[in-house]
Amino acid sequence: YDGNYAAPEQGLDFSHISLTNLNTSIDSILYQGKEINAHIKEFFVEERSGLKVSALAGNVRSDHEQIDVPDLLLQTPNSEVRLTATIPWSSLEDHPQGSMKALLNASLGKEDLLIAAGSLPEDFKKAYPDKPLAITAGVEGNLSSIRITQGDIMLPGAFQMNVTGSMESVTDSIRRTGEIQLKARSGNLDFLLAMLPASQRDQFAIPAGIQLKGEATVANQEYRTELVLTQDKGKVGLTARYNPVKLA
Protein backbone atom coordinates (compact mmCIF):
# COMPACT_ATOMS: atom_id res chain seq x y z
CA TYR A 1 0.00 0.00 0.00
CA ASP A 2 1.37 3.42 -1.03
CA GLY A 3 -0.67 6.39 0.16
CA ASN A 4 1.45 9.11 -1.43
CA TYR A 5 4.41 9.70 -3.72
CA ALA A 6 6.85 10.60 -0.94
CA ALA A 7 9.63 8.22 -0.01
CA PRO A 8 8.79 5.90 2.92
CA GLU A 9 9.73 7.23 6.34
CA GLN A 10 12.11 5.27 8.53
CA GLY A 11 10.28 2.82 10.77
CA LEU A 12 6.58 2.03 10.48
CA ASP A 13 5.06 4.37 7.88
CA PHE A 14 1.28 3.91 7.51
CA SER A 15 1.41 5.66 4.13
CA HIS A 16 3.72 2.94 2.81
CA ILE A 17 2.82 -0.53 4.06
CA SER A 18 4.66 -3.47 2.51
CA LEU A 19 3.86 -6.98 3.79
CA THR A 20 5.82 -10.13 3.01
CA ASN A 21 5.89 -13.77 4.11
CA LEU A 22 2.19 -13.79 4.97
CA ASN A 23 1.07 -17.11 6.40
CA THR A 24 -2.30 -17.71 8.04
CA SER A 25 -4.53 -20.57 9.14
CA ILE A 26 -8.23 -19.97 9.86
CA ASP A 27 -10.89 -22.63 10.31
CA SER A 28 -14.57 -22.78 11.26
CA ILE A 29 -15.40 -19.76 9.11
CA LEU A 30 -19.03 -18.67 8.98
CA TYR A 31 -20.22 -15.34 7.56
CA GLN A 32 -23.89 -14.63 6.96
CA GLY A 33 -25.22 -11.16 7.76
CA LYS A 34 -24.48 -10.53 11.43
CA GLU A 35 -23.62 -14.18 12.02
CA ILE A 36 -19.84 -14.58 12.09
CA ASN A 37 -17.73 -17.38 13.48
CA ALA A 38 -13.99 -17.59 12.88
CA HIS A 39 -11.24 -19.46 14.68
CA ILE A 40 -7.81 -17.99 13.94
CA LYS A 41 -5.13 -20.62 14.55
CA GLU A 42 -1.99 -19.16 13.01
CA PHE A 43 -0.87 -15.85 11.55
CA PHE A 44 2.57 -14.62 10.54
CA VAL A 45 3.58 -11.54 8.54
CA GLU A 46 6.59 -9.25 8.13
CA GLU A 47 6.44 -5.52 7.40
CA ARG A 48 9.02 -3.42 5.54
CA SER A 49 9.94 -1.56 8.75
CA GLY A 50 11.12 -4.75 10.45
CA LEU A 51 7.96 -5.24 12.50
CA LYS A 52 6.89 -8.89 12.62
CA VAL A 53 3.62 -10.45 13.74
CA SER A 54 4.58 -13.94 14.83
CA ALA A 55 1.16 -15.07 16.06
CA LEU A 56 -2.49 -14.06 16.04
CA ALA A 57 -4.86 -16.55 17.61
CA GLY A 58 -8.36 -16.58 19.03
CA ASN A 59 -12.06 -16.72 18.28
CA VAL A 60 -14.41 -14.08 16.90
CA ARG A 61 -18.12 -14.86 17.16
CA SER A 62 -21.21 -12.84 16.30
CA ASP A 63 -24.95 -13.46 16.11
CA HIS A 64 -27.96 -11.17 15.79
CA GLU A 65 -27.49 -9.94 19.37
CA GLN A 66 -23.78 -9.32 19.95
CA ILE A 67 -20.14 -9.70 18.93
CA ASP A 68 -17.96 -11.83 21.21
CA VAL A 69 -14.17 -11.81 21.28
CA PRO A 70 -13.45 -14.14 24.23
CA ASP A 71 -9.66 -14.01 23.94
CA LEU A 72 -7.74 -12.65 20.97
CA LEU A 73 -3.95 -12.77 21.29
CA LEU A 74 -1.47 -10.97 19.04
CA GLN A 75 2.26 -11.58 19.48
CA THR A 76 5.49 -10.32 18.00
CA PRO A 77 8.95 -11.56 19.00
CA ASN A 78 9.03 -8.70 21.55
CA SER A 79 5.43 -7.80 22.40
CA GLU A 80 2.05 -9.23 23.31
CA VAL A 81 -1.46 -7.76 23.02
CA ARG A 82 -4.55 -9.50 24.41
CA LEU A 83 -8.14 -8.37 23.77
CA THR A 84 -11.41 -9.52 25.35
CA ALA A 85 -14.66 -7.89 24.26
CA THR A 86 -18.43 -8.28 24.26
CA ILE A 87 -20.26 -5.79 22.04
CA PRO A 88 -24.07 -5.93 21.71
CA TRP A 89 -25.21 -4.65 18.33
CA SER A 90 -27.74 -2.47 20.17
CA SER A 91 -24.88 -0.56 21.84
CA LEU A 92 -23.87 0.80 18.41
CA GLU A 93 -27.33 2.00 17.33
CA ASP A 94 -28.51 5.63 17.16
CA HIS A 95 -30.53 5.05 20.33
CA PRO A 96 -28.28 2.54 22.11
CA GLN A 97 -29.59 0.16 24.76
CA GLY A 98 -27.05 -2.58 25.38
CA SER A 99 -23.66 -2.10 27.03
CA MET A 100 -20.34 -3.15 25.54
CA LYS A 101 -17.34 -4.29 27.57
CA ALA A 102 -13.78 -4.40 26.29
CA LEU A 103 -10.46 -5.01 28.01
CA LEU A 104 -7.05 -4.71 26.39
CA ASN A 105 -3.77 -5.77 27.99
CA ALA A 106 -0.52 -5.05 26.19
CA SER A 107 3.17 -5.50 26.85
CA LEU A 108 5.13 -3.62 24.17
CA GLY A 109 8.83 -4.34 23.81
CA LYS A 110 11.50 -1.72 23.19
CA GLU A 111 12.30 -3.00 19.71
CA ASP A 112 8.70 -2.67 18.48
CA LEU A 113 8.22 0.76 20.07
CA LEU A 114 11.33 2.12 18.37
CA ILE A 115 10.17 0.75 15.01
CA ALA A 116 6.77 2.42 15.45
CA ALA A 117 8.39 5.71 16.51
CA GLY A 118 10.34 6.01 13.27
CA SER A 119 13.43 8.20 12.97
CA LEU A 120 15.07 8.85 16.36
CA PRO A 121 18.61 9.75 17.47
CA GLU A 122 20.81 6.68 17.88
CA ASP A 123 21.83 7.81 21.38
CA PHE A 124 18.17 7.88 22.41
CA LYS A 125 17.58 4.38 21.05
CA LYS A 126 20.46 3.12 23.18
CA ALA A 127 19.38 5.06 26.30
CA TYR A 128 15.69 4.08 26.18
CA PRO A 129 14.98 1.51 28.94
CA ASP A 130 15.07 -2.10 27.80
CA LYS A 131 11.79 -2.86 29.55
CA PRO A 132 8.30 -3.46 28.15
CA LEU A 133 5.71 -0.69 28.19
CA ALA A 134 2.64 -2.10 29.99
CA ILE A 135 -0.82 -0.88 28.97
CA THR A 136 -4.20 -1.84 30.43
CA ALA A 137 -7.32 -0.24 28.94
CA GLY A 138 -10.93 -1.08 29.74
CA VAL A 139 -14.20 0.52 28.64
CA GLU A 140 -17.88 -0.11 29.32
CA GLY A 141 -20.99 1.48 27.88
CA ASN A 142 -22.40 2.46 24.51
CA LEU A 143 -22.62 5.42 22.15
CA SER A 144 -24.91 7.19 24.64
CA SER A 145 -22.73 6.76 27.72
CA ILE A 146 -19.25 5.27 27.97
CA ARG A 147 -16.87 4.88 30.89
CA ILE A 148 -13.15 4.18 31.14
CA THR A 149 -13.00 1.41 33.73
CA GLN A 150 -9.24 0.94 33.52
CA GLY A 151 -6.52 3.08 32.04
CA ASP A 152 -2.98 2.34 33.19
CA ILE A 153 0.33 2.89 31.42
CA MET A 154 3.67 2.02 33.00
CA LEU A 155 7.29 1.91 31.92
CA PRO A 156 9.01 0.27 34.91
CA GLY A 157 11.43 2.62 36.62
CA ALA A 158 10.51 5.55 34.33
CA PHE A 159 6.85 6.51 34.83
CA GLN A 160 3.37 5.33 35.60
CA MET A 161 0.06 6.89 34.58
CA ASN A 162 -3.59 6.31 35.41
CA VAL A 163 -6.56 7.63 33.43
CA THR A 164 -10.25 7.38 34.33
CA GLY A 165 -13.31 9.13 32.98
CA SER A 166 -16.69 9.01 31.32
CA MET A 167 -18.61 10.63 28.48
CA GLU A 168 -22.29 11.12 27.70
CA SER A 169 -23.87 11.62 24.25
CA VAL A 170 -20.66 10.40 22.64
CA THR A 171 -21.68 10.98 19.01
CA ASP A 172 -23.56 14.25 19.57
CA SER A 173 -21.13 17.16 19.21
CA ILE A 174 -23.65 19.62 20.70
CA ARG A 175 -24.93 17.68 23.74
CA ARG A 176 -21.70 15.81 24.47
CA THR A 177 -20.44 16.00 28.07
CA GLY A 178 -17.60 14.23 29.79
CA GLU A 179 -14.62 14.32 32.06
CA ILE A 180 -11.23 12.61 32.22
CA GLN A 181 -8.97 12.44 35.27
CA LEU A 182 -5.22 11.94 34.93
CA LYS A 183 -2.61 10.98 37.50
CA ALA A 184 1.04 10.38 36.67
CA ARG A 185 4.33 10.00 38.51
CA SER A 186 7.82 9.91 37.06
CA GLY A 187 10.85 7.88 38.01
CA ASN A 188 14.15 8.08 36.16
CA LEU A 189 13.63 10.02 32.92
CA ASP A 190 17.28 10.73 32.20
CA PHE A 191 17.04 8.79 28.93
CA LEU A 192 15.03 11.71 27.49
CA LEU A 193 18.16 13.86 27.59
CA ALA A 194 19.57 11.69 24.82
CA MET A 195 17.20 13.53 22.46
CA LEU A 196 19.42 16.62 22.91
CA PRO A 197 22.77 17.22 21.24
CA ALA A 198 25.55 15.67 23.33
CA SER A 199 27.06 19.11 24.03
CA GLN A 200 23.84 20.30 25.75
CA ARG A 201 22.92 17.33 27.93
CA ASP A 202 24.98 18.41 30.94
CA GLN A 203 23.01 21.67 31.06
CA PHE A 204 19.77 19.94 32.00
CA ALA A 205 18.53 17.58 34.69
CA ILE A 206 15.17 15.84 35.01
CA PRO A 207 14.32 15.22 38.68
CA ALA A 208 12.62 12.00 39.76
CA GLY A 209 9.31 12.03 41.59
CA ILE A 210 7.50 14.52 39.36
CA GLN A 211 3.74 14.22 39.90
CA LEU A 212 1.07 15.32 37.45
CA LYS A 213 -2.62 15.56 38.25
CA GLY A 214 -5.22 16.91 35.91
CA GLU A 215 -8.77 16.91 34.68
CA ALA A 216 -10.24 17.60 31.26
CA THR A 217 -13.95 18.26 30.73
CA VAL A 218 -16.33 18.97 27.88
CA ALA A 219 -19.77 20.56 28.27
CA ASN A 220 -21.84 22.98 26.20
CA GLN A 221 -19.34 22.50 23.36
CA GLU A 222 -16.56 23.95 25.53
CA TYR A 223 -13.39 22.05 26.40
CA ARG A 224 -11.56 22.78 29.66
CA THR A 225 -8.43 21.41 31.27
CA GLU A 226 -6.67 21.93 34.57
CA LEU A 227 -3.22 20.46 35.21
CA VAL A 228 -0.97 20.67 38.27
CA LEU A 229 2.64 19.49 38.16
CA THR A 230 4.54 19.18 41.44
CA GLN A 231 8.06 18.14 42.42
CA ASP A 232 9.28 18.44 46.00
CA LYS A 233 8.21 21.99 46.97
CA GLY A 234 7.75 23.25 43.43
CA LYS A 235 4.40 23.55 41.66
CA VAL A 236 3.26 24.58 38.18
CA GLY A 237 -0.39 24.94 37.21
CA LEU A 238 -2.10 25.19 33.84
CA THR A 239 -5.71 26.14 33.13
CA ALA A 240 -7.07 26.31 29.60
CA ARG A 241 -10.35 26.31 27.75
CA TYR A 242 -11.40 26.13 24.12
CA ASN A 243 -14.80 26.86 22.61
CA PRO A 244 -14.90 26.39 18.82
CA VAL A 245 -18.40 27.91 18.63
CA LYS A 246 -17.26 31.26 20.04
CA LEU A 247 -14.28 31.29 17.67
CA ALA A 248 -16.43 30.71 14.60
What are these regions (language model features)?
Residues 104-109, 116-119, 128, 133, ...:
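Long, compositionally biased, intrinsically disordered segments
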Residues 7, 38-41, 117-120, 194-198:
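Short Pro/Gly-enriched beta-strand edge/turn motifs at strand-loop
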Residues 1-3, 17-32, 54-65, 71-74, ...:
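Extended lipid/amphipathic-ligand handling interfaces
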Residues 51, 193-197, 240:
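Outer-membrane beta-barrel translocator domains and adjoining extracellular loop/strand segments
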Residues 9-11, 121-125, 198-202:
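Extracellular loop and loop/strand-boundary signature of outer-membrane beta-barrel proteins
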Residues 1-6, 39-45, 72, 107-109, ...:
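Generic short beta-strand segments
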